[in-house]
Amino acid sequence: TNTGDNRLAALVANNGVGETSLSKTGTGTWILTNPDSTYTGVTTITGGVLGVDKLADGGLASSIGMSSGASANLVIGNGGTLRYTGTGDTTNRGFTLAAGTTAIQSSGTGAVEFNNANAIAYSGNGLRVISLGGVNADDNIMGASIGDQNASNITALAKNDAGKWILTGDNAYTGSTNINGGTLVLGNGGTTGSIASGTVNNFGLLGFNRSDTLTYGGLIQGSGDLQQAGAGVTVLTGDNTYSGSTDVLAGTLRINGDQSSATGLTSVAAGA
């Protein structure tokens, strides 16, 4: 239950007979600092925080071993948090999220990129909230596609803490998107990165960074800011009520909905 940064520097390997698996239980925090662990079993977080200094592609040594990138090999349970604490890594590992609230955080000195574009796997039945958080303000990227488990078990997304996360998957979840702090960006300058037309409760910064045309028809509300940063065209068709600023840094922001209740200031950079 100790929530301080308990650290384990040992190299975790298979036992010579079978696979070793690692399970983080309880409400406390453990940080795995050895980048060369080679165990090939499942890493499970059933509670609290599991911090990792090193992430790598499936099959390569890392703080959570060298199991394959299959989603079944990294499981985050209700109330569990995977916290990246390293200097910057990219991984193609998938993961499985339980029903309830699960979290992925980036709080190292460098950003982390999950570049596996497959759909996130789910276990158990029930509503779920996926939280992306941490204090790292660099370009942390979630490439996996976030969807509902089914029509009865929908998913919502929360962006917590002061850091920045970029969604590059084309996400189909139908729950709300809640930006409680920091920055959430759709797209990383390419032609992917979107959310379904649900409600965005924005109390941070919502960014659009695509090179093509993206239409968003959901409601954007809250006191947060909106930023058009990509070279493409973003079309807002919802009746938005947010009170933060609207900043067009590049490309085109087109309003095809009722923006009269969006009361913040609007600025347009030269050339946008």
Where are the predicted features?
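NAD(P)H cofactor-binding loop motif with strongest signal on the N-terminal glycine-rich segment
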Residues: 35
